[in-house]
Swiss-Prot record:
It is found in: Cytoplasm. Pathway: Cofactor biosynthesis; thiamine diphosphate biosynthesis. GO terms for cellular component: cytoplasm. Its EC number is 2.8.1.10. Keywords: Cytoplasm, Schiff base, Thiamine biosynthesis, Transferase. The keyword Transcription does not apply. It catalyses: [ThiS sulfur-carrier protein]-C-terminal-Gly-aminoethanethioate + 2-iminoacetate + 1-deoxy-D-xylulose 5-phosphate = [ThiS sulfur-carrier protein]-C-terminal Gly-Gly + 2-[(2R,5Z)-2-carboxy-4-methylthiazol-5(2H)-ylidene]ethyl phosphate + 2 H2O + H(+). It is an enzyme of class 2 (transferase). Homotetramer. Forms heterodimers with either ThiH or ThiS. GO terms for molecular function: thiazole synthase activity. This is Thiazole synthase. 1-deoxy-D-xylulose 5-phosphate binds at G156, A182, G183, N204, T205. The lineage of its organism: Bacteria, Pseudomonadati, Pseudomonadota, Gammaproteobacteria, Vibrionales. HAMAP family: ThiG (MF_00443).
Length: 255
Protein backbone atom coordinates (compact mmCIF):
# COMPACT_ATOMS: atom_id res chain seq x y z
CA UNK A 1 0.00 0.00 0.00
CA UNK A 2 1.16 3.52 -0.80
CA UNK A 3 0.44 6.09 1.89
CA UNK A 4 0.35 9.79 1.07
CA UNK A 5 -0.95 12.21 3.66
CA UNK A 6 -4.08 10.76 5.20
CA UNK A 7 -4.85 8.29 2.38
CA UNK A 8 -3.66 4.86 1.30
CA UNK A 9 -3.62 3.63 -2.29
CA UNK A 10 -3.47 0.12 -3.68
CA UNK A 11 -2.79 1.42 -7.19
CA UNK A 12 0.45 3.25 -7.89
CA UNK A 13 -0.88 4.60 -11.17
CA UNK A 14 -2.34 8.10 -10.87
CA UNK A 15 -4.19 9.57 -13.81
CA UNK A 16 -5.18 12.87 -15.36
CA UNK A 17 -8.58 13.83 -16.76
CA UNK A 18 -7.63 16.13 -19.64
CA UNK A 19 -7.53 15.47 -23.39
CA UNK A 20 -10.14 12.69 -23.46
CA UNK A 21 -12.71 13.00 -26.25
CA UNK A 22 -15.58 12.76 -23.76
CA UNK A 23 -16.22 12.24 -20.06
CA UNK A 24 -17.60 8.72 -20.47
CA UNK A 25 -14.41 7.53 -22.18
CA UNK A 26 -12.37 9.25 -19.48
CA UNK A 27 -14.28 7.50 -16.70
CA UNK A 28 -14.02 4.10 -18.38
CA UNK A 29 -10.29 4.43 -18.98
CA UNK A 30 -9.60 5.55 -15.42
CA UNK A 31 -11.71 2.74 -14.02
CA UNK A 32 -9.90 0.13 -16.14
CA UNK A 33 -6.54 1.57 -15.07
CA UNK A 34 -7.37 0.83 -11.45
CA UNK A 35 -6.27 4.35 -10.54
CA UNK A 36 -7.58 5.67 -7.24
CA UNK A 37 -6.40 9.25 -7.69
CA UNK A 38 -7.19 11.54 -10.63
CA UNK A 39 -6.00 15.09 -11.06
CA UNK A 40 -8.08 17.80 -12.70
CA UNK A 41 -7.86 21.50 -13.36
CA UNK A 42 -10.38 23.50 -11.35
CA UNK A 43 -11.13 25.60 -14.44
CA UNK A 44 -12.63 22.48 -16.09
CA UNK A 45 -15.08 21.82 -13.26
CA UNK A 46 -18.49 23.46 -12.90
CA UNK A 47 -18.44 23.91 -9.13
CA UNK A 48 -22.09 25.00 -9.11
CA UNK A 49 -23.31 21.82 -10.79
CA UNK A 50 -23.39 18.79 -8.49
CA UNK A 51 -23.98 16.59 -11.54
CA UNK A 52 -20.91 17.90 -13.34
CA UNK A 53 -20.08 15.64 -16.29
CA UNK A 54 -16.46 15.28 -15.20
CA UNK A 55 -16.90 14.82 -11.47
CA UNK A 56 -19.77 12.37 -11.23
CA UNK A 57 -18.30 9.39 -13.12
CA UNK A 58 -15.15 9.58 -11.00
CA UNK A 59 -16.96 10.01 -7.71
CA UNK A 60 -19.26 7.12 -8.59
CA UNK A 61 -16.20 4.92 -9.27
CA UNK A 62 -14.68 5.83 -5.91
CA UNK A 63 -11.75 7.75 -7.39
CA UNK A 64 -10.17 10.41 -5.18
CA UNK A 65 -10.02 13.85 -6.77
CA UNK A 66 -6.79 15.84 -6.86
CA UNK A 67 -7.47 19.40 -8.03
CA UNK A 68 -4.47 21.12 -9.55
CA UNK A 69 -3.49 24.76 -9.88
CA UNK A 70 -2.80 24.56 -13.61
CA UNK A 71 -2.85 28.04 -15.09
CA UNK A 72 -1.26 29.68 -12.07
CA UNK A 73 1.70 31.84 -13.00
CA UNK A 74 2.94 32.62 -9.50
CA UNK A 75 2.57 31.57 -5.87
CA UNK A 76 -0.27 34.00 -5.18
CA UNK A 77 -2.36 32.60 -8.05
CA UNK A 78 -1.68 29.03 -6.97
CA UNK A 79 -2.68 29.62 -3.34
CA UNK A 80 -5.89 31.30 -4.46
CA UNK A 81 -6.73 28.41 -6.83
CA UNK A 82 -6.09 25.88 -4.06
CA UNK A 83 -8.39 27.76 -1.70
CA UNK A 84 -11.14 27.80 -4.34
CA UNK A 85 -10.72 24.07 -4.90
CA UNK A 86 -10.94 23.31 -1.19
CA UNK A 87 -14.14 25.31 -0.88
CA UNK A 88 -15.72 23.92 -4.04
CA UNK A 89 -14.71 20.27 -3.82
CA UNK A 90 -14.33 19.80 -0.09
CA UNK A 91 -10.77 18.49 -0.27
CA UNK A 92 -7.54 19.84 1.17
CA UNK A 93 -5.50 17.87 -1.35
CA UNK A 94 -3.86 19.90 -4.11
CA UNK A 95 -1.43 19.24 -6.92
CA UNK A 96 0.65 22.39 -6.98
CA UNK A 97 1.49 23.51 -10.51
CA UNK A 98 3.04 26.86 -11.40
CA UNK A 99 4.29 27.25 -14.95
CA UNK A 100 4.39 30.84 -16.24
CA UNK A 101 5.74 29.91 -19.69
CA UNK A 102 2.83 28.61 -21.82
CA UNK A 103 5.12 27.13 -24.49
CA UNK A 104 7.20 24.67 -22.48
CA UNK A 105 5.15 24.56 -19.25
CA UNK A 106 8.29 24.32 -17.14
CA UNK A 107 7.49 24.58 -13.41
CA UNK A 108 8.78 27.69 -11.64
CA UNK A 109 10.90 26.38 -8.73
CA UNK A 110 11.00 29.63 -6.76
CA UNK A 111 7.26 30.28 -6.87
CA UNK A 112 6.50 26.59 -6.29
CA UNK A 113 8.54 26.49 -3.08
CA UNK A 114 6.96 29.73 -1.83
CA UNK A 115 3.44 28.48 -2.56
CA UNK A 116 4.15 25.10 -0.98
CA UNK A 117 5.22 26.73 2.28
CA UNK A 118 2.04 28.82 2.41
CA UNK A 119 -0.29 25.97 1.49
CA UNK A 120 1.21 23.62 4.08
CA UNK A 121 0.72 26.33 6.72
CA UNK A 122 -2.90 26.61 5.58
CA UNK A 123 -3.51 22.90 6.16
CA UNK A 124 -3.27 21.58 2.61
CA UNK A 125 -1.83 18.22 1.61
CA UNK A 126 0.51 19.44 -1.10
CA UNK A 127 1.84 17.40 -4.01
CA UNK A 128 4.09 19.76 -6.01
CA UNK A 129 4.91 19.26 -9.69
CA UNK A 130 8.54 20.28 -10.08
CA UNK A 131 11.77 19.87 -11.99
CA UNK A 132 13.79 16.73 -11.35
CA UNK A 133 16.03 18.77 -9.08
CA UNK A 134 17.24 16.83 -6.02
CA UNK A 135 17.91 19.99 -4.02
CA UNK A 136 14.48 21.46 -4.75
CA UNK A 137 12.71 18.18 -3.99
CA UNK A 138 14.48 18.00 -0.64
CA UNK A 139 13.46 21.57 0.16
CA UNK A 140 9.84 20.82 -0.76
CA UNK A 141 9.94 17.79 1.53
CA UNK A 142 11.39 19.90 4.35
CA UNK A 143 8.61 22.50 4.18
CA UNK A 144 6.03 19.74 4.62
CA UNK A 145 4.90 18.52 1.19
CA UNK A 146 3.25 15.10 1.40
CA UNK A 147 5.01 13.90 -1.76
CA UNK A 148 7.08 15.33 -4.60
CA UNK A 149 6.22 15.02 -8.29
CA UNK A 150 9.36 15.55 -10.38
CA UNK A 151 9.00 15.50 -14.15
CA UNK A 152 10.27 12.72 -16.34
CA UNK A 153 10.20 15.00 -19.39
CA UNK A 154 8.18 18.08 -20.44
CA UNK A 155 4.40 17.84 -20.02
CA UNK A 156 2.71 16.03 -22.89
CA UNK A 157 6.00 15.36 -24.69
CA UNK A 158 5.80 11.54 -24.35
CA UNK A 159 9.62 11.49 -24.26
CA UNK A 160 9.80 9.20 -21.26
CA UNK A 161 12.32 9.30 -18.43
CA UNK A 162 14.70 11.95 -19.77
CA UNK A 163 15.70 12.98 -16.24
CA UNK A 164 16.76 9.47 -15.19
CA UNK A 165 19.99 10.35 -13.35
CA UNK A 166 18.37 13.09 -11.30
CA UNK A 167 15.32 11.00 -10.49
CA UNK A 168 17.59 8.30 -9.08
CA UNK A 169 19.08 10.83 -6.65
CA UNK A 170 15.65 12.17 -5.68
CA UNK A 171 14.33 8.67 -5.01
CA UNK A 172 17.43 7.73 -3.03
CA UNK A 173 17.26 10.67 -0.65
CA UNK A 174 13.49 11.16 -0.33
CA UNK A 175 11.60 10.52 2.89
CA UNK A 176 8.25 11.18 1.20
CA UNK A 177 6.72 9.39 -1.80
CA UNK A 178 8.15 10.26 -5.21
CA UNK A 179 5.59 10.37 -8.02
CA UNK A 180 7.10 10.71 -11.49
CA UNK A 181 4.90 13.12 -13.40
CA UNK A 182 4.93 14.39 -16.99
CA UNK A 183 6.50 13.03 -20.14
CA UNK A 184 5.56 9.39 -19.62
CA UNK A 185 4.45 8.37 -23.09
CA UNK A 186 4.45 4.57 -23.07
CA UNK A 187 3.85 1.76 -20.58
CA UNK A 188 7.57 0.93 -20.80
CA UNK A 189 8.37 4.41 -19.49
CA UNK A 190 6.11 3.85 -16.50
CA UNK A 191 7.69 0.45 -15.84
CA UNK A 192 11.14 2.01 -15.96
CA UNK A 193 10.18 4.66 -13.41
CA UNK A 194 8.80 2.00 -11.08
CA UNK A 195 11.88 -0.21 -11.53
CA UNK A 196 13.98 2.76 -10.38
CA UNK A 197 12.05 2.84 -7.13
CA UNK A 198 9.52 5.59 -7.79
CA UNK A 199 6.50 5.22 -5.54
CA UNK A 200 3.99 6.02 -8.28
CA UNK A 201 3.59 7.63 -11.70
CA UNK A 202 1.01 10.04 -13.05
CA UNK A 203 -0.10 9.54 -16.65
CA UNK A 204 -2.53 11.58 -18.74
CA UNK A 205 -1.67 12.29 -22.37
CA UNK A 206 -0.34 8.81 -23.16
CA UNK A 207 -3.68 7.29 -22.17
CA UNK A 208 -6.08 10.02 -23.30
CA UNK A 209 -4.47 10.52 -26.73
CA UNK A 210 -4.08 6.82 -27.52
CA UNK A 211 -6.12 5.31 -30.35
CA UNK A 212 -7.78 3.11 -27.72
CA UNK A 213 -7.55 4.88 -24.34
CA UNK A 214 -9.24 2.05 -22.44
CA UNK A 215 -6.81 -0.58 -23.73
CA UNK A 216 -3.88 1.76 -23.10
CA UNK A 217 -5.08 2.35 -19.55
CA UNK A 218 -4.97 -1.40 -18.94
CA UNK A 219 -1.48 -1.58 -20.45
CA UNK A 220 -0.27 1.13 -18.07
CA UNK A 221 -1.84 -0.65 -15.13
CA UNK A 222 0.07 -3.82 -15.97
CA UNK A 223 3.31 -1.92 -16.59
CA UNK A 224 3.18 -0.14 -13.24
CA UNK A 225 2.45 -3.37 -11.42
CA UNK A 226 5.26 -5.26 -13.17
CA UNK A 227 7.73 -2.41 -12.66
CA UNK A 228 6.96 -2.29 -8.94
CA UNK A 229 7.24 -6.07 -8.70
CA UNK A 230 10.64 -5.99 -10.42
CA UNK A 231 11.89 -3.29 -8.06
CA UNK A 232 10.83 -5.26 -5.01
CA UNK A 233 12.33 -8.46 -6.43
CA UNK A 234 15.69 -6.74 -6.82
CA UNK A 235 17.08 -6.19 -10.29
CA UNK A 236 20.36 -7.88 -11.17
CA UNK A 237 23.28 -5.45 -11.11
CA UNK A 238 24.87 -4.12 -14.28
CA UNK A 239 28.46 -5.01 -15.21
CA UNK A 240 30.75 -3.74 -17.96
CA UNK A 241 31.79 -7.17 -19.20
CA UNK A 242 30.07 -10.35 -20.32
CA UNK A 243 29.17 -13.01 -17.75
CA UNK A 244 28.14 -16.36 -19.21
CA UNK A 245 24.95 -17.77 -17.79
CA UNK A 246 26.18 -21.34 -18.42
CA UNK A 247 29.99 -21.47 -18.09
CA UNK A 248 31.45 -24.19 -20.35
CA UNK A 249 35.13 -24.14 -19.36
CA UNK A 250 35.13 -27.16 -17.07
CA UNK A 251 32.97 -29.16 -19.47
CA UNK A 252 35.36 -28.59 -22.38
CA UNK A 253 38.39 -29.50 -20.27
CA UNK A 254 36.89 -32.91 -19.61
CA UNK A 255 36.57 -33.75 -23.32
Amino acid sequence: MLKIGDKEFKSRLFTGTGKFSNSHLMAEAIQVSGSQLATMALKRVDVHDQQDDILQPLIHAGVNLLPNTSGAKNAKDAVFAAQLAREALGTNWVKLEIHPDPKYLMPDPIETLAAAEQLVRDGFIVLPYCHADPVLCKRLEEVGCAAVMPLGAPIGSNKGIASHDFLEIIIDQANVPVVVDAGIGAPSHAARAMEMGADAVLVNTAIAAASNPVAMAKAFKMAVESGRMAYKAGLAGKVSHAVASSPLTAFLDEL
